[in-house]
Amino acid sequence: FQPIKESIVSRLFNAVAAEDLIVKGGREIVPGMIVTGMEVAEIDGAPR
């Protein structure tokens, strides 16, 4: 049995830490398309 590793989604339930994780999560998801802010939450499936 392997424990489930903590993911960004599980850490986002902490609203205090969530904003920093979302801000740091900005990235290029396909060539020429950069996501930032709450779009990162959408891409990662975050519960926000």
From Swiss-Prot:
Cofactor: Fe cation
Keyword Ubl conjugation appears in the UniProt entry: no
CC per GO annotation: chloroplast
Keyword tags: Chloroplast, Iron, Metal-binding, NAD, Plastid, Thiamine biosynthesis, Transferase
Residues bound to substrate: 18, 40
Gene Ontology biological-process annotations: thiamine biosynthetic process
Primary location group: plastid
Cofactor binding remark: Binds 1 Fe cation per subunit.
GO terms for MF: cysteine-dependent adenosine diphosphate thiazole synthase activity; metal ion binding
Protein's cellular compartments: Plastid, Chloroplast
Catalyzed reactions per annotation: [ADP-thiazole synthase]-L-cysteine + glycine + NAD(+) = [ADP-thiazole synthase]-dehydroalanine + ADP-5-ethyl-4-methylthiazole-2-carboxylate + nicotinamide + 3 H2O + 2 H(+)
E.C. numbers: 2.4.2.60
Function: Involved in biosynthesis of the thiamine precursor thiazole. Catalyzes the conversion of NAD and glycine to adenosine diphosphate 5-(2-hydroxyethyl)-4-methylthiazole-2-carboxylic acid (ADT), an adenylated thiazole intermediate. The reaction includes an iron-dependent sulfide transfer from a conserved cysteine residue of the protein to a thiazole intermediate. The enzyme can only undergo a single turnover, which suggests it is a suicide enzyme. May have additional roles in adaptation to various stress conditions and in DNA damage tolerance.
The family this protein is said to belong to: Belongs to the THI4 family.
Subunit structure: Homooctamer.
Designated name of the protein: Thiamine thiazole synthase, chloroplastic
The gene coding this protein: THI1
